[in-house]
């Protein structure tokens, strides 16, 4: 289903790759043409709203489910959640070598939250534009997958980066943290500057690679869905979109798992004294 009577593939792709943006200077939404204007005081409202909304869904759902937990007659939802928790606990025990009660809950939150954000990619590409076009008589650019927004993925990885710095200083102390920067990998004072440059690059590359890996994989997956929708008529799209959607479920789960595991690994490295 196309958004314009005279279908144009570049315009179709461009429309689906734009965000619903809010101008913070006047608190007004930008229309599709305004999205070409680059402004520092503009935020991707769709990504922020959906990220917060899905986070609240997780909190409320887990809170309500926790009230119904029972040992005698567990329901299917409880069994599923227990399997997820056991899976994450086992990964934390195998990877994280310190003692920290925050790591397991943090890993659970990261895994479930990213999984739900990635899962939005399975919603049909044209569904929301179709609803707005036919019921509200307006065309708005909107992206339903928060993890295809580099601002979201980098923001999450920066939180992990701050935790790395925090636990490095907390466990090793300021002196130990500075030793890691200036005395690794070479202990000779001659290499202080070289060590600092090398370790700084290594430290800063962690959040960058963590955020860009998630963004790149999810963005590429969305691009394939858009190309399938744009190049094929609606009655042929299922031939490619259904197999790709099934395969994409694996990508969705895998990217959530990779982000979680790398977070545990980085925090374990930060908590280990040399």
From Swiss-Prot:
InterPro entries: ATP_syn_F0_a_bact/chloroplast, ATP_synth_F0_asu, ATP_synth_F0_asu_AS, F0_ATP_A_sf. GO terms for molecular function: proton-transporting ATP synthase activity, rotational mechanism. It is found in: Cell membrane. It is a multi-pass membrane protein. SUPFAM superfamilies: F1F0 ATP synthase subunit A. One of its GO terms (biological process) is proton motive force-driven plasma membrane ATP synthesis. GO terms for cellular component: plasma membrane; proton-transporting ATP synthase complex. Keywords: ATP synthesis, Cell membrane, CF(0), Hydrogen ion transport, Ion transport, Membrane, Transmembrane, Transmembrane helix, Transport. The chain crosses the membrane at residues 40-60, 110-130, 149-169, 224-244, 245-265. It holds the Pfam family ATP-synt_A. Key component of the proton channel; it plays a direct role in the translocation of protons across the membrane. F-type ATPases have 2 components, CF(1) - the catalytic core - and CF(0) - the membrane proton channel. CF(1) has five subunits: alpha(3), beta(3), gamma(1), delta(1), epsilon(1). CF(0) has three main subunits: a(1), b(2) and c(9-12). The alpha and beta chains form an alternating ring which encloses part of the gamma chain. CF(1) is attached to CF(0) by a central stalk formed by the gamma and epsilon chains, while a peripheral stalk is formed by the delta and b chains. Belongs to the ATPase A chain family. This is ATP synthase subunit a. It comes from Buchnera aphidicola subsp. Baizongia pistaciae (strain Bp). The lineage of its organism: Bacteria, Pseudomonadati, Pseudomonadota, Gammaproteobacteria, Enterobacterales. The gene is atpB.
């Amino acid at each position: 289903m196309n958004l314009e009577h005279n279908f144009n593939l570049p315009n179709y792709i461009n429309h689906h790759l734009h965000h619903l943006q809010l101008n913070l200077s006047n608190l007004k939404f930008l229309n599709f043409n305004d999205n070409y204007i680059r402004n520092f005081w503009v935020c991707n409202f769709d990504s922020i709203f959906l990220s917060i909304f899905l986070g609240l869904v997780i909190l409320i759902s887990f809170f309500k489910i926790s009230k119904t937990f029972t040992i005698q007659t567990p329901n299917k939802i409880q069994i599923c959640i227990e399997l997820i928790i056991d899976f994450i606990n086992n990964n934390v025990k195998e990877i994280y070598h310190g003692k920290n009660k925050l790591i397991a809950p943090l890993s659970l939150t990261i895994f479930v939250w990213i999984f739900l954000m990635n899962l939005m990619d399975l919603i049909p590409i044209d569904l929301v534009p179709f609803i707005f076009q036919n019921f509200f008589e307006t065309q708005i650019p909107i992206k339903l997958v928060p993890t295809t927004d580099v601002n979201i993925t980098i923001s999450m990885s920066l939180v992990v980066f701050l935790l790395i710095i925090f636990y490095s200083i907390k466990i090793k102390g300021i002196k130990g943290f500075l030793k890691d920067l200036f005395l690794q990998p070479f202990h000779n004072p001659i290499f202080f500057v070289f060590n600092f440059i090398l370790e700084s690059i290594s430290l800063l590359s962690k959040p960058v690679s963590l955020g860009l890996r998630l963004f790149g994989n999810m963005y590429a997956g969305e691009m394939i869905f858009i190309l399938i929708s744009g190049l094929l008529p609606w009655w042929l799209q299922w031939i490619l979109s259904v197999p790709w959607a099934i395969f994409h479920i694996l990508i969705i789960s895998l990217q959530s798992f990779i982000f979680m595991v790398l977070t545990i690994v980085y925090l374990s490295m930060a908590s280990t004294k040399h």
